[in-house]
């Protein structure tokens, strides 16, 4: 849900990790299989590097190299660390060398940082959004 809100067939936006091309997976079950595989690999890598599991979740958005970055910078995913990685690693690798930002109007993002994201820099609030969505699922499952 965090990725696409269920609006595309690649519900977990896992195409890039599989083929390197966005939206190349057109089957929801395949998207989920690929997404679970990537998250599982990230969790194993996070355990190997002795970082928190939320680093693995954030790496689902940024890519596996984020796990090593966190391991070298305190071992715990934070919005501040994700912001630095987005600005200094992800965004420049995809052409944003000027630090250009835009506003991401999403409640969790607005709460944690005014909604600012770096253009081509991934989502620095991704792990927090997943945490919030898990909270909502737990809350509504009790009704």
Stretches found by the model and what they are:
Residues 5-6, 17-33, 37, 41-143:
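Non-catalytic cell-wall polysaccharide-engagement segments
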Residues 12-16:
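Conserved catalytic-core motifs characterized by acidic clusters
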Residues 2-11:
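Conserved alpha-helical segments that form or flank metal/cofactor-binding pockets of metalloenzymes
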